[in-house]
């Protein structure tokens, strides 16, 4: 029996898509670019959405659009609605596509970003077989350009390759929980062997800040880097995805420079196009605009404490 005293609202998907863009990008101007509308059109859409649901979604503080308590609550539902809508449409479009997709990923995405992508792909393409290759980012990019893999998740943004930004994550200085570092002393670094973007970043940032450094341990795998840092052999630089209870974060309080965010991309090679790869890439690209992999957030001080097992679930 229908309760006529509370009419059911039919939410406009365009309004939801714009709302999620504003929530993720924090300004109407940035969201307008993302959804291909004018800034005034985005503002009008958000007014319509607030009128429709009868709640204020944004706090009125300057240009940055911070979510109210109702806005935060509504954002989770908006993402789910868009996800189900997009997956339903995509599954009907691509349900008959068969074949094998080869995805390449680096160590630091293998247990964080990769599972999310695999879930998305299998939901939309149920008849698809997937092969995964885990190697260093530079090697993955070479394999992609050689046509040995179809898609790659990497931190390297090659403008010559079509790519989708999957996530932006804080980049942090890590040491073991009981590691002692005094501001001004030589930084002992634990790094991957070259080529490594995080190694290069650490050296460049310390050199630019005039902080003395030395390489105390060189590893060939990320697991070896983790082990060396946990053993107290030195400090390393990685994105927030590496955080674990055995590690702690160093930063500006210890005199270390603030690091630029890490961006994770999904790339394909236009010289090795095929229907399968193009369909999957397009499905993921459309998904990231509305509900996939929201930006990892948090101030340095908030990220200093080791996360609980429960909080780590939010990363994936």
Curated annotation (Swiss-Prot):
Alphabetized UniProt keyword annotations: DNA-binding, Transcription, Transcription regulation
Stated family: Belongs to the LysR transcriptional regulatory family.
Highest taxon above the source species: Bacteria
CDD domains, per database record: PBP2_LrhA_like
Record feature DNA-binding region, as residue ranges: 28-47
Basic and acidic residues bias: start-end ranges: 301-316
SUPFAM superfamilies (alphabetical): Periplasmic binding protein-like II (SSF53850), Winged helix' DNA-binding domain (SSF46785)
Role: Regulates pectinase gene expression.
Any one GO molecular function term: DNA-binding transcription factor activity
Domain (HTH lysR-type) ranges: 11-68
PANTHER family according to UniProt: HTH-TYPE TRANSCRIPTIONAL REGULATOR LRHA-RELATED, TRANSCRIPTIONAL REGULATOR
Region spans: Disordered: 293-316
Name by which UniProt lists this protein: HTH-type transcriptional regulator PecT
